[in-house]
Amino acid sequence: MHSMREKTQDECDLLDRARRLVPMLKARTAQADKDLKVPVESVLELQSAGLLRALQPRAFGGYEVDPRTFFEIQTILAEGCMSTAWIYGVMGVHPWQLARYPIETQREVWGEDHSALICSTYMPAAQVTVVEGGYRISGRWGFSSGSEHC
């Protein structure tokens, strides 16, 4: 037998916020299709609603929801705009990935700004060189969905 736990108030609130965005996302779908990118306004609404911090640790201003709730949010957003739901899924999972890094790395990213957005590419072909004052990273990346919003 499989039992499901009750949703937290934060999870319920995030799901409600996602539902409230659906009409606005739907209204921009044609523009997103025409421009071949998610409108900046849509990403700002995701951010303003706290949805991009759904998987972010509470210690850094996130909601630390379970993956099931994260995917429920994504499914709701898809009712408004599939492209926005895709971007949400890609951008929204990065806080979960960063949460697996050492705490020092998390502090470096979220220490002063809990709203910092993260992007990455899953197929990097790069070279890292130590230079005076830090590192130089050069390489080629075919794409990184959502990177223009980070």
Locate the predicted segments by residue.
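Alpha-helical interface subdomain recognition
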Residues: 2-56, 62-72
